[in-house]
Amino acid sequence: TQDLVMFSSTHEDPNALAKQAEEIAIRESGIERAYGWDYDRNYDIYVANGDGSNLINLSNADGYDAEGSYSADGTKILFASNRQAYSRTLSQAEQALFEDDSSYFMDLYVMNADGSDVTQLTRSPVYDGGPFYSPDGSKITWRRFNPDGNSAEIWTMDADGRNQRQLTAAGM
């Protein structure tokens, strides 16, 4: 039996090759840029067999779906997503914030390992990402960036999203 591999990818983005060509041209031009990350709205979470066969898109929603991690028993997947920015009408103020920083609506979600039953766990006006389950599956730990995005703190909550609390205070 083969092990499944979970990953996030934009390979189904119809503009992926054009974006790649643009990035290559920038690098070849000698232009130096500060590090940046693109929360591409075409990121989705996939599973496949270890040899790449049986590729399945689990999240298949408009928005950045990435940073996935399995529960210890393999039945759940935690992930970060800004799908709310694409699935509802934003106010003018929200639209301006999102255009300035596409991580503005980044919250944590959980879904079954087959991609069903997606549930939003956090609702924060800042970036929530990098979620992991505790070994017994009762808690989730993640990072939450401050509003300017310059530092992050470690947070924890119950596996159902209740009892959120900050564990560190280094950057605040």
Task: Identify the residue ranges that each predicted region occupies.
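Residue-level detector of Asp-centered blade-edge/turn motifs that repeat once per structural unit
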Residues: 72-73, 135-136
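Short loop/turn segments that connect beta-strands within beta-propeller blades
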Residues: 49-53, 112-116, 158-162
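Hydrophobic beta-strand positions that form the internal "hydrophobic ladder"
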Residues: 5-6, 77, 140
